[in-house]
Curated annotation (Swiss-Prot):
Main location: periplasm
Pfam families the record matches: SBP_bac_8
Cellular compartments annotated: Periplasm
Family, per entry: Belongs to the bacterial solute-binding protein PotD/PotF family.
Protein known as: Spermidine/putrescine-binding periplasmic protein
Signal peptide: 1-23
Length: 348
């Protein structure tokens, strides 16, 4: 999840409707989601339409959500929103259950291009909610975007101490692995080490790591080039910063946040109703406009303004998407990535 939006929503626990202590399993739904990921008033609308009260709480990372589900095994949550390879990880570990798509009458609204990704073939365990990508950010007032075509351009010596990288081990290594011609999902220790050695060469060019909002350093004039999330770049442009998105020839880094039902959910039927509600075009449009990231809902996209719907940084064409790579679970190799990443940052 790439967390920055036009609006700041309340974090932590938010109870909508009556207390869980006085609610039965079927008329209360426990929804655990990313901070800033639901527009104000939307869950109240769901409650008004269905009678199901939503107990809403938020998290800041997949790791936090995963640990909470591992800790509370008594069905503490009915709906969660894991990202890309966490869907893969959680389905393999039996933490999320198969979704009865016959009860999702709005499933057909989803863009076929956003379905059947490697982390969940056939979407048996997850339903796309929001997606996005990491690409190259360029301040067009300082650098001609036409001169930047590849991840390799970030290694050029003229950009010493002027780049921004996202503070994300998998993303940073995926960039280097793609530059070297390897898969960004490799589990080969030698390939990961090669990426580490390549990234060491990049460090003199790096001015900052940022995953709170990678667009901020661009907006504040601290950097003019580097990695950026396409949604935050779009919002930055709307705020007046000429932050262009360049899709590198090696391919962008794609991610998706999906709706999933924990294996021990107590209100599966309520979760399915909320998923179906969130798949409505009018609702998905509101979510996308609030968050500032692309919606996988094709019917909702048709409701967006032409300025947004036709923006190629938000909605790249099929060829650009096909060149990119979706992150998959790398199992035990994640520890190797993290070890090298910490060494990389410590050695700056």
């Amino acid at each position: 999840m790439k967390k920055w939006s036009r609006h700041l929503l309340a974090a932590g626990a938010l109870a909508l409707g009556m207390s869980a202590a006085h609610a039965s399993d079927n008329d209360t739904l426990y929804f655990y989601n990313w901070t800033e990921y639901v527009p104000p008033g939307l869950l109240e609308q769901f409650t008004k339409e269905t009678g199901i009260k939503v107990i809403y709480s938020t998290y800041e990372s997949n790791e936090t959500m995963y640990a909470k589900l591992k800790t509370y095994k008594d069905g503490a949550y009915d709906l969660v929103v894991p990202s890309t390879y966490y869907v893969d990880k959680m389905r393999k570990e039996g933490m999320i259950q198969k979704i009865d798509k016959s009860k999702l009458t709005n499933f057909h609204n989803l863009d076929p291009e956003m379905l059947n990704k490697p982390f969940d073939p056939n979407n048996d365990y997850s339903v796309p909610y929001i997606w996005g990508a990491t690409a190259i950010g360029v301040n067009s007032d300082a650098i001609d975007p036409k001169t930047i075509t590849s991840w390799a351009d970030l290694w050029k010596p003229e950009y010493k101490n002027s780049l921004l990288l996202t503070d994300d081990a998998r993303e940073v290594f995926q960039m280097a692995l793609r530059k070297l011609g390897y898969s960004g999902n490799t589990t080969d220790p030698k390939e990961i080490e090669a990426a580490y050695e390549e990234l060491k060469k990049l460090m003199p060019n790096v001015a900052a790591f940022n995953s709170d909002n990678p667009a901020n350093p661009y907006m504040e004039g601290e950097v003019n080039l580097g990695m950026v999330w396409n949604g935050s770049a779009f919002v930055a442009r709307q705020a007046g910063t000429p932050l262009e998105v360049v899709w590198p020839k090696e391919g962008g880094i794609f991610w998706m946040d999906s709706l999933a039902i924990p294996a021990n959910a107590k209100n599966k039927e309520g979760a399915l109703k909320l998923i179906n509600f969130l798949l409505r075009p009018d609702v998905a449009k509101e979510v996308a406009e609030t968050i500032g990231y692309p919606t996988p809902n094709l019917a909702a996209r048709k409701l967006l303004s032409p300025e947004v719907a036709n923006d190629k940084s938000l909605y790249p064409d099929a060829q650009t998407i096909s060149k990119g790579e979706w992150q998959n679970d790398v199992g035990d190799a994640s520890a190797i990535y993290e070890e090298y990443y910490q060494k990389l940052k410590a050695g700056r």
